[in-house]
Amino acid sequence: MGKEFLIKELFVKPKGILSLQKHHHRAEHWLVTQGNAKITLNKDIIIKKPGEHIFIPLEAIHRVQNPGKKPVKIMEAQVGSILKETDIVRYQDIYGRVK
């Protein structure tokens, strides 16, 4: 199967945090469009501001947090052979979705 593409917009509420996760079949490219995003990429913590971007490689452990008082918005471009929500391995999750 060839490479597929999917674009979606992520919203992270103030003081919110998404699950710590990785993907077996896709890489992601994030462009911050609003707020300051605190991004975990493997063992690194990176702050990205509006207009800044980051590449999340295949198999990289990652998450985004919003340490601020305003929502964070990120445009996410997914590239890979499988672009489904089933391609998520979660390590930490405040909603109890770690298997």
What are these regions (language model features)?
Residues 63-99:
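Double-stranded beta-helix
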Residues 13, 25, 32, 49, ...:
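A short, compositionally biased micro-patch
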Residues 5, 25-43:
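Glycine- and acidic-residue-biased ligand/ion/polar-headgroup-sensing regions
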Residues 16, 25-26, 44, 60-61, ...:
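A generic "binding-loop/recognition-motif" signal
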Residues 7-11, 29, 45, 53-55:
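Conserved hydrophobic/aromatic beta-strand scaffold that supports enzyme active sites
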